[in-house]
Amino acid sequence: MEVNQGEIVGFLGPNGAGKTTSFYMITGLIVPNAGRIFLDDEDITDLPMFKRAQKGVGYLAQEASVFRHMTVEQNIMSVMEMSKQFTKAEREERHEALLDEFNLHKVRKSKGIQLSGGERRRCEIARALAIDPKFILLDEPFAGVDPIAVEDIQYIIAKLKYKNIGVIITDHNVGETLAIIDRAYLLYEGSILQSGTPEDLAADEEVRTKYLGSTFTLKRSAAFLRAEAGGPQRLNTKAEHEAVAPSPQSEPTVPEE
């Protein structure tokens, strides 16, 4: 499996297929029992999570991760203060830019516990981008978000391509996910059943039989159509003898389960 910078790739599949496990292996939350993970031709399989983050692998967990008793601006700034890549002036400038980009100015003084589902997600994504990652993994980004806010989150995710960020997304809301991704890997019982564009998967009879259902209809979201763009570089995952990860000309990998 591989993911390029500047594209959005879905990890799809039924419960127990291996989606979250793959995420955990990429981020370093668990150690794979087979296969290797590479980033920019560097084997990062044995690196701890914080080292992977320093090298450009961001992660947004399925569970709410906003600091509940800190304000929005404190949530974002706290992450940047742990990084030595920005000066104080650069941190302040970047902080204001993120608040503006994610439309968080009105709630900047609000504590995490006071935010709506959509505001919380925007804050979490802004915080994940604070240290300028090459790749970001989004685990269930639409969970706990009301339908009206889903399109806002879709647009934010779709725009990440313009920043040359590689996005890996998994969500049980398959319709909303396929509506914004460039391509996907469909995991089934720990293996890759099929891969391709949303159109390829929607037209595949085996995919419809085992996962999408016979009545599924693919509909691209307005967010995707507005934000459609491209970019270089890759992240990927493979079997033990050929695992790989992203780079301008290289890629990260996660082993099969």
PLM feature segments, named:
Residues 43-63, 88-92, 201-206:
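ABC ATPase NBD coupling module
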Residues 111-115, 119:
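Conserved ABC ATPase signature
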Residues 132:
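Conserved catalytic motifs of ABC-family nucleotide-binding domains
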Residues 136-140:
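Catalytic Walker B motif of ABC-type/P-loop ATPase nucleotide-binding domains
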